[in-house]
């Protein structure tokens, strides 16, 4: 990890306040990370309270284990398995679910993890280093069309075709990408127009990381599970860091907080319709200037909050 950088939890107070913690409540932190949110939640729980923390990253699990708090249950899995793991733990409903999405600062700043183009390190990018395919392995076998699609769709990179073509051309010459430095250099050659303040490798690294870790697939899988698990009055709090994540969250919350659409002219009053499963709470929240001065990486963070309706829907989306 780079020296001198201190991990600062994004929207720490805001996220935990949004959960409206009950001392005897049951809460889920879907992304423990280095435990900033979880520690604050635990500080507000009483002896009967409970927190279940998920994380794929073995390093995060090690940090969580050090807390040694009987109210904390640690799950070394991705949050897409929320239903399965809560069933295993004998938990039905919960009072709040928190998701702090994306890659964490410690992961970015640890050169050995292969998330950053700032270091020359093995091209890994797995959040869970105990399983799955590395970025280097995938780039060594994927065809040009698949690489192009991933970089275009998950990185919104205009030069996705050029980058994919160059990767495959290098392979045909026996030159396989094995380090972050090699991939960053290739991107620099292919991205002809650079965005101000952005490295030419930024979008490609984001795209491959999202794909390797199935980040958007897992997000789409967990949102409806979270709604079903919330008891009436329970809160869902989601912090997103880029437009692809936030678009999924925004559309899901919009649909889950809207009444069902009915054919025009149907003789049904609004009062007769079932209550939507969610109610939006406040407006989207961003970090303030003071916090951004301490943690510039939080500039893209946006938090959305919703509350489970009093009338439960079996058909929560």
UniProtKB/Swiss-Prot annotation:
User: For this chain's UniProt record, which GO biological process terms are given?
Assistant: rRNA base methylation
Query: Main localisation, per the record?
Result: cytoplasm
Sequence intervals crossing the membrane:
none
SUPFAM superfamilies according to UniProt: Putative methyltransferase TM0872, insert domain, S-adenosyl-L-methionine-dependent methyltransferases
Q: What class of enzyme is it?
A: transferase
Q: List GO terms (cellular component aspect).
A: cytoplasm
GO MF: rRNA (cytosine-N4-)-methyltransferase activity
Reply yes or no: does the keyword Membrane apply. no
Please state the Enzyme Commission number of this protein.
2.1.1.199
Q: What InterPro entries does the database record attribute to this sequence?
A: RsmH, SAM-dep_MeTrfase_MraW_recog, SAM-dependent_MTases_sf
Q: Which reaction does it catalyse?
A: cytidine(1402) in 16S rRNA + S-adenosyl-L-methionine = N(4)-methylcytidine(1402) in 16S rRNA + S-adenosyl-L-homocysteine + H(+)
Question: Where S-adenosyl-L-methionine is bound, by residue?
Answer: 35-37, 55, 79, 100, 107
Domain of life according to the entry? Bacteria
Which UniProt keywords are given for this protein, alphabetically ordered?
A: Cytoplasm, Methyltransferase, rRNA processing, S-adenosyl-L-methionine, Transferase
Record's subcellular location:
Cytoplasm
* HAMAP family registered for this protein in UniProt: 16SrRNA_methyltr_H (MF_01007)
Family per record: Belongs to the methyltransferase superfamily. RsmH family.
Summary of the function given for this chain in its UniProt record: Specifically methylates the N4 position of cytidine in position 1402 (C1402) of 16S rRNA.
What is the name listed in the Swiss-Prot or TrEMBL entry for this protein? Ribosomal RNA small subunit methyltransferase H
């Amino acid at each position: 990890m780079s020296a001198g950088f201190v991990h600062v939890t994004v929207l720490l107070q805001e996220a935990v306040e949004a959960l409206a913690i009950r001392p005897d409540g049951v809460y889920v932190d879907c992304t423990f990370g280095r435990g900033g949110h979880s520690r604050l939640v635990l500080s507000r729980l009483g002896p009967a309270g409970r927190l279940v923390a998920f994380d794929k990253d073995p390093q995060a699990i090690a940090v969580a284990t050090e807390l040694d708090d009987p109210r904390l249950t640690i799950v070394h899995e991705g949050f897409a398995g929320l239903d399965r793991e809560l069933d295993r733990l004998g938990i039905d409903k919960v009072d709040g679910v928190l998701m702090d999405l994306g890659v964490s600062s410690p992961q970015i700043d640890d050169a050995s993890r292969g998330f950053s183009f700032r270091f020359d390190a093995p091209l890994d990018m797995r959040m869970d280093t105990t399983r799955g395919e590395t970025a280097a392995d995938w780039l060594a076998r994927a065809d040009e069309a698949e690489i192009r699609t991933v970089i275009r769709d998950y990185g919104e990179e205009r030069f996705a075709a050029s980058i994919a073509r160059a990767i495959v051309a290098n392979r045909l010459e026996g030159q396989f990408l094995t380090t972050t430095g090699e991939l960053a250099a290739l991107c620099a050659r292919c991205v002809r127009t650079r965005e101000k303040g952005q490295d030419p490798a930024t979008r490609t690294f984001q795209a491959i990381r999202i794909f390797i870790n199935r980040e958007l697939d897992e997000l789409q899988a967990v949102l409806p599970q979270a709604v079903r698990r919330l008891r009436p009055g329970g809160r869902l709090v989601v912090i997103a860091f880029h437009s692809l994540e936030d678009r999924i969250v925004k559309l899901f919350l919009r649909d889950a907080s809207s009444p069902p659409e009915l054919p025009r002219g149907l003789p049904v009053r609004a009062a007769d319709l079932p209550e939507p499963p969610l109610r939006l709470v406040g407006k989207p929240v961003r970090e303030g200037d003071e916090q951004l001065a301490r943690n510039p990486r939080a500039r893209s963070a946006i938090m959305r909050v919703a509350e489970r309706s009093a009338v439960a829907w079996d058909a929560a989306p």
